[in-house]
């Protein structure tokens, strides 16, 4: 004969409830706890002054255009190198990097001519194209009226800058751009649009803006076409805009 056991039903139910709650709490904590990082951040030299970070790819060092070619035919870039800067030589053509990139941090310094000529889009005009397709406008926008999404720092014909942070003509200016390329699915299906964050002279002017598509000259919705990595392009718009200290970090 088996011995008889006496159970206190309320106590048993309470004990089981506590056990279940404990298990639920442990499961919840496991599901919501921030995972501990496994990899120690890489140590780099951030550089000082105009010196690029140690993990950057220098695209223009103030001496040579060896990293640049003409968009038209791939021949060597014909812009002028003077006083540590490359200068647009009107009519020689838009140039691009030999290398191609995806997600990047881009630093570039530029200056429009000190002598003001023209107005609107005819004054110190150039452009920086990410992956050869998506333009951040370069323009003398200091006391220079033009359409809003054509100002310096605009994602051209898509987004005006949040503020106009332009310096006087002839003064050096900086763009720091965080660019994430679009992600495509089957065919030309866009799973995620390209995004840009832009700082102009240290001031935020584009805040994780979703790019509608490749730059067009008309204010119409552009259409994405599936692509891979692409070059950085600097535009010859006929004005002697200067560029220097150009580098990227691949993200």
Protein language model regions, located:
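Bacterial N-terminal signal peptides
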Residues: 13-24
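N-terminal secretory signal peptides that target proteins for export/translocation
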Residues: 1-7
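Carbohydrate-interacting regions of secretory-pathway proteins
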Residues: 26-251
């Amino acid at each position: 004969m088996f011995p008889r056991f006496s159970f206190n039903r309320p106590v048993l139910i309470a004990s089981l409830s506590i056990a279940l709650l404990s298990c639920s709490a442990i499961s919840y904590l496991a599901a919501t706890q921030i995972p501990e990082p496994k990899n120690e951040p890489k140590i780099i030299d951030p550089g000082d002054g105009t010196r690029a970070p140690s993990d950057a790819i220098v695209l223009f060092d103030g001496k040579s255009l060896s990293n640049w070619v003409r968009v038209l035919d791939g021949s060597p870039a014909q812009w002028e190198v003077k006083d540590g800067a490359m200068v647009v030589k009107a009519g020689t053509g838009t140039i691009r990097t030999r290398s191609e990139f995806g997600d990047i941090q881009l630093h570039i310094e530029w200056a429009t001519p000190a002598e003001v000529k023209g107005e609107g889009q005819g004054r110190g005009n150039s452009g920086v194209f990410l992956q050869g397709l998506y333009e951040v406008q370069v323009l003398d926008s200091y006391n220079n009226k033009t359409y809003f999404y054509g100002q310096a720092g605009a994602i051209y014909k898509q987004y005006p800058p949040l503020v106009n942070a332009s310096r006087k003509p002839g003064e050096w200016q900086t763009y720091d751009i965080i660019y994430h390329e679009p992600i495509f699915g089957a065919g030309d299906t866009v799973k995620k649009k390209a995004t840009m964050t832009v700082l102009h002279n240290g001031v935020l002017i584009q805040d994780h803006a979703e790019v509608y598509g490749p730059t067009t000259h008309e204010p119409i919705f552009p259409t994405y076409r599936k692509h891979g990595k692409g070059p950085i392009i600097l535009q010859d718009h006929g004005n002697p805009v200067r560029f220097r200290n150009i580098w990227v970090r691949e993200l």
